[in-house]
């Protein structure tokens, strides 16, 4: 049997609940254990129901052998229950869990990371929000939105009043504390968290692989996670508006200018400082050059400042990486693999966004907008936070889903959001309602952004890694610009930041073109 199989784990939960009261543990001990098992059985069914709808409800461990040892099929073939009944069942388990679990566990040094009353209530809120969404609620039954709001608001109140949870981060520019929150195993933002360790011993290690995957190859990371042009161009400008709606000018080449503070903690790009433990001034360089000027015009992949060969994007995902990540050696691979950074499956920002969405769904626009502003205020926005005071109805719901896409980017939440809101195409009119482009058609094609050396700068026809046009350390340095004097540090003071931006602007304008790399057919087209 697959030890990670969902039905095997449901059986394990059922065996526990069937037998726990037969032991000699105290009632207090039994209740704490029951609360945790009710939660995890609910979690298993939550994943099943949100994926398949109705599934068989099995509340007690099945016995495949009856009497003489023959299999009694009538006890095993459990019919599929309705989605309604399954949602009710999961909510009952979560209510049971919430009634038995503490708001905060005693002795945090031993128990931190265990599920809590607030975590159970937050998962119930997430499930009921899913159930109120168009995937399961084609008729837009307002009663479901009411139930989702009640559950999510109750979770928010429990977590902030009794659970010692809060939105983490001062309102300083460029979201420095927001970045650090993701790698702090004791963060008060965490509601449901997976803890890892940085142990190297195979017998005891439980490492988070994200850091190794996200870091570039030149520092012996896994190669980096390429950010798409669609995501880079989607992030708000500094005024909170989409680039297409902002009063600030958006230059696709200088995509880093005047962006939402979270942009600088979500992406890493040419010329930006991306520190780790043993190199606090490490600067990303991942532009691309070609065999010669003709190849550059044709857009044929060439060489990268990062490493030989084609690259899918000059922009990496930075989010959830640790500025103090330990790099054991620049001479061997896997040096970031011993990461102990946690993963937050549910955090306070999601709970707040769930409250906002459910409030909007039930028609309470004022509450929805208030909670939506909480998300932006904690990263430095003030006043209207980029939202019109008259935002309401479908337009407000569209803004909430947009904020989810930004705040929760690269946290594994977008797929379910697209499913529950039927954003694949506009068959059910949700895309038109929300004012978003359907995912189908050309939207399924994801494009990389390659920053390529301008063709007119080529003075020879060499293509090797030692012919880097901007690196004085290269043996055949072209001398057109010196990149070693450039580093855009998101932690810099405001005055230094402005000077660094101006220097980077000059480098981009004089040396680089933005090239669209089509991930479907492998072509690169200059823009």
Segments (PLM) and residue ranges:
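C-terminal substrate/ligand-recognition segments
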Residues: 256-375
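Extended, compositionally biased alpha-helical segments that mediate assembly or anchoring
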Residues: 462-527
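An aromatic- and glycine-enriched ligand-binding surface/loop that stacks and positions planar moieties
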Residues: 1, 55, 59, 95, ...
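Conserved, well-structured interaction surfaces
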Residues: 1-53, 74-88, 92-110, 251-257, ...
């Amino acid at each position: 049997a697959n030890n990670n199989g969902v039905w095997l784990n449901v059986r394990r939960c059922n065996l526990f609940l069937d037998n726990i009261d037969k032991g000699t543990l105290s009632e207090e001990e039994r209740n704490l254990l029951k609360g945790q098992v009710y939660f995890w059985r609910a979690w298993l069914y939550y994943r099943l129901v949100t994926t398949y709808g109705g599934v068989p409800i099995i509340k007690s461990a099945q016995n495949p052998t009856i009497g003489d040892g023959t299999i009694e099929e009538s006890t095993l073939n459990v019919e599929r229950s309705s989605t309604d009944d399954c949602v009710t069942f999961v909510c009952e388990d979560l209510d049971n869990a919430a009634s038995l679990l503490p708001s905060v566990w005693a002795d945090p040094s031993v128990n931190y990371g265990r599920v809590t009353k607030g975590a159970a209530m937050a998962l119930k809120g997430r499930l009921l929000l899913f159930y109120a969404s168009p995937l399961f609620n084609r008729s837009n039954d307002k009663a479901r939105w009411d139930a989702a709001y009640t559950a999510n608001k109750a979770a928010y109140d429990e977590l902030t009043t009794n659970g010692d949870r809060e939105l983490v981060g001062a309102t300083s520019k460029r979201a420095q504390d927001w970045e650090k929150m993701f790698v702090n195993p004791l963060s008060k933002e965490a509601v449901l968290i997976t803890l890892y360790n940085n142990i190297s011993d195979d017998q005891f290690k439980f490492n988070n692989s994200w850091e190794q995957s996200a870091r570039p190859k030149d520092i012996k990371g896994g190669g980096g996670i390429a950010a798409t042009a669609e995501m880079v161009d989607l992030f708000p400008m500094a005024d909170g508006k989409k680039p297409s709606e902002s009063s600030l000018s958006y230059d696709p080449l200088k995509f880093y200018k005047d962006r939402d503070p979270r942009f600088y903690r979500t992406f890493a790009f040419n010329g930006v400082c991306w520190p780790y433990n043993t190199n606090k001034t490490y600067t990303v360089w991942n532009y691309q050059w070609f065999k010669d000027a003709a190849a550059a015009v044709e857009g044929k992949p060439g060489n990268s400042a990062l490493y030989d060969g084609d690259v899918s994007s000059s922009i990496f995902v930075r989010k959830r990486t640790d500025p103090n990540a330990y790099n054991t050696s620049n001479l061997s691979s896997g040096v970031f693999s011993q990461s102990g950074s946690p993963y937050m499956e549910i955090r306070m920002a999601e709970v707040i966004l769930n409250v906002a969405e459910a409030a909007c769904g039930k028609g309470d626009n004022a509450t929805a907008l208030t909670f939506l502003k909480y998300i932006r205020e904690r990263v430095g926005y003030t006043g209207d936070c980029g939202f019109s005071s008259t935002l309401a109805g479908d337009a407000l719901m569209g803004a909430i889903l947009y904020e989810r896409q930004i705040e929760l980017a690269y946290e594994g939440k977008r797929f379910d959001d697209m499913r529950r809101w039927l954003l694949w195409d506009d068959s059910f009119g949700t895309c038109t309602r929300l004012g978003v482009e359907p995912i189908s058609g050309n939207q399924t094609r994801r494009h990389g952004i390659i920053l390529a050396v301008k063709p007119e700068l080529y003075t020879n026809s060499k293509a090797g890694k030692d012919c880097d046009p901007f690196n004085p350390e290269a043996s055949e340095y072209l001398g057109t610009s010196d990149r070693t004097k450039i580093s855009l540090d998101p932690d810099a003071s405001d005055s230094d930041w402005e000077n660094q931006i101006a220097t980077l602007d000059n480098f981009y304008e004089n040396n680089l073109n933005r090239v669209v790399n089509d991930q479907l057919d492998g072509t690169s087209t200059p823009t």
